[in-house]
Amino acid sequence: MIAREWKARCPKEQKKDFIKYLYQTGVKDTSSTKGFKDAQILSRDLEDKVEITLITYWDCLESIKTYAGDDIEVARLYPEDFRYELEPDDFVIHYEVINSIF
């Protein structure tokens, strides 16, 4: 299994709305892609912003290509991201999941 991690920062007052939007875009699109297994959204407060992390889980790298395109290291961003004053990471990180107990 492969974990795909993407991060972005936004103003704290945008957190609730951005997470709702993230469900409507990134989570919706990934979860409807063959090979998708699960997703987690994490957040942590920074000094004046909040950092949101989306981790999606996939059966293999080929499934991620179906969602992300040939260059799976490039983050898939959405046209309305700017509404949330988002500071997105342009690239994602992939991990091999060795073990998962939950």
PLM region spans:
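Active-site-flanking beta-strand signature of metal-NTP-handling nucleotidyl enzymes
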Residues: 2-8
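Short hydrophobic/aromatic beta-strand micro-patches
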Residues: 9, 42, 55-57
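Non-catalytic surface loops within mature trypsin-like serine protease
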Residues: 10-12, 60, 96-99
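Short, glycine- and small/hydrophobic-rich beta-strand elements in well-ordered beta-sheets
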Residues: 27-53
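Glycine-rich beta-strand-turn "strand-cap" elements at beta-sheet edges
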Residues: 2, 40-50, 77-102
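An amphipathic, aromatic/His-enriched active-site/gating alpha helix that lines ligand/cofactor pockets
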Residues: 24, 28-36, 57-93
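Short, surface-exposed ligand-recognition loops at beta-strand->loop->(often short) alpha-helix junctions
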Residues: 9-22
